Design a protein with these regions (language model features):
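Mature catalytic domains of secreted/periplasmic carbohydrate-active enzymes
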Residues: 1-227
Length: 227
């Protein structure tokens, strides 16, 4: 399946769609294009599936320190994004979870909301594997993908697959992980930066870093094919 993932809201909190939850969005811009809607139209035209990136962490929203209020805010966002106005959504890529303890995000509410509106949507949370009670979500070396062991704990639960950008998983990736004593099958989705040394966006300070060469991308892809 071919799909694209569009950023709906990054850590800065700016919403790239026509939202009624905040004025920190495209409606307050001179260019009021609903970016998510335009990408959805292009996907439909070219036969490509649509996925969404959404940052849990928000450096702008005033209610962010209040876990309950902020969870309501996120649910309102995800309801708008998943209610069908943008068509079928095949993946939700959640990021920024390291900024609060795991329980603060109320991932069960997020997961249930998305699955109710888009039952086939697959949900992943960055830095999925680790101890659930980690204060910041920052793991030790044990929980880097190359070190994953069968039955390691799932930190970000519930979710459908594992993320840990931009790290590679081991070739004999076990895929079986646990939460509250129950085992779950969770494949790994690989993400690769356009430039080497963990550079996701264009910035002058990264301009001299080499681009990821195609041979390395192909090599990584072939490793993932075996897992």
């Amino acid at each position: 399946m071919n799909y694209v993932i569009v950023i709906t809201k990054h850590h800065d909190g700016f919403c790239m769609w026509d939202t009624h939850t905040t004025d920190y969005c495209i409606n307050s811009s001179q260019n009021k294009t609903d970016v998510v809607a335009e990408v959805a139209k292009a996907c439909k035209k070219h036969g490509v599936k649509l996925g969404l990136y959404y940052s849990l962490w928000d450096r702008h929203e005033k209610c962010y320190p209040d876990d309950e209020a902020y969870a309501d805010y996120m649910i309102a966002h995800l309801t708008e994004l998943m209610d069908g106005r943008y068509g079928e959504i095949v993946e939700l890529w959640l990021d920024g979870e390291w900024d609060k303890p795991c329980r603060s995000w109320q991932l069960d509410r997020i997961y249930n909301t998305v699955k109710t509106l888009q039952p086939k949507c697959q949900i992943g949370v960055n830095q999925t594997i680790g101890e659930f009670n980690d204060e910041t979500g920052a793991p030790g070396e044990r929980y880097l993908p190359v070190n994953y062991q069968e039955n390691d704990p799932i930190r970000m639960f519930p979710s459908d697959f594992r993320l840990w950008d931009p790290n590679m998983c081991r070739e004999d990736d076990p895929k079986i992980y646990t939460f509250n004593g129950e085992k779950y099958y969770m494949p790994f989705e690989q993400t690769i930066c356009s430039r080497k040394d963990f550079s996701w966006f264009y910035c002058d300070i990264y301009a001299d870093k080499p681009m990821m060469d195609k041979e390395e991308i192909i090599r990584n892809y072939k490793i993932l094919e075996k897992t």
